[in-house]
Amino acid sequence: MIKGLAITPPVLGRISIGKIVEKNGKRVPEKDDQFTITSQIQNKDGWVKHPLDEQLRAKAPNQNQKLRSIPVRMIFNDPELNLRAEYSLFDRQTGRLICSGDGESCQRLGQNGVEQHPCPSPNLCPLAQGGLCKPYGRLYINLDESDEFGTFIFRTTGFNSIRTLAARLRYYHAASGDLLSCLPLQLTLRGKSTTQSYRTPIYYVDLTLKDGVNLNDAITSAKQIDEQSKAAGFYQEALDYVARQGYGNASFEVGGDEGLDIVEEFYNDESKSQQHEQSHNLTHVQDIQKGLQQSVQALN
């Protein structure tokens, strides 16, 4: 295997809750209140939608076919293999990742190559002042059963999404007895208002069981799937092991070819006046109210 090249899950497409638009001659992020599933191809209008976007949108329970939940499957049992997250500082001009840390230690490009330094988190790091460093998370998920190892990637710099996804993955992993990859899950878009958002709703991504499935039934189903897979010779532990090795094959997981896209979407100076989570006007509140009420009813 080539050293210095991070081996990450094969990506078939992207899941986002926003898009890049042109305003005043500049390309800036525009937030949204729904999911969009795209391919990895761009044209003059932006990312080309993946066929799965239209298929899932047609099944959406709301009248305007806004996609606010997506059925998904995790590829790995280890939560940290499905969700990757670090504090990340990019060069705004080249898109090159300069520093990546976990709050304790970091890998940083220096005069002598990649150097190891303490990571005090962005609030306390002199290199990160001015919002240059943010948490950057990538969730790898499977949407298409015809390609068991193909993934769609959800990228975010939002604390709410990263924190919620990390918690859910660990809880489901523990509750199912290390059968995370066998659970029937779905991505769910949620909204809340805070003082920081000036009481307008901000949107973040949650991970839940599929609608109509309780935890006991999900675990029972996961055990059956696990037994069938083992009987067929499938070795999940080996898959997790190889994935862990692949991630660790390089100092930085993010390649230079995708760095500029990440900077444009998440580290854009024009977006400082916006919330780094998905925020919208109060006019959108009524539009998502039914979805939020359904979530509450499901919990009750």
Regions from the PLM with identified roles:
Residues 178, 184, 260, 264-267, ...:
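Primarily single-stranded nucleic-acid-binding OB-fold modules
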Residues 128-216:
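Extended serine/threonine-enriched, polar tracts that run as long, contiguous segments within proteins
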Residues 170, 174-178, 210-212, 223-227, ...:
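Generic surface-pattern signal
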Residues 1-146, 198-200, 272, 276, ...:
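OB-fold ssDNA-binding interfaces and closely related basic DNA-contact patches used
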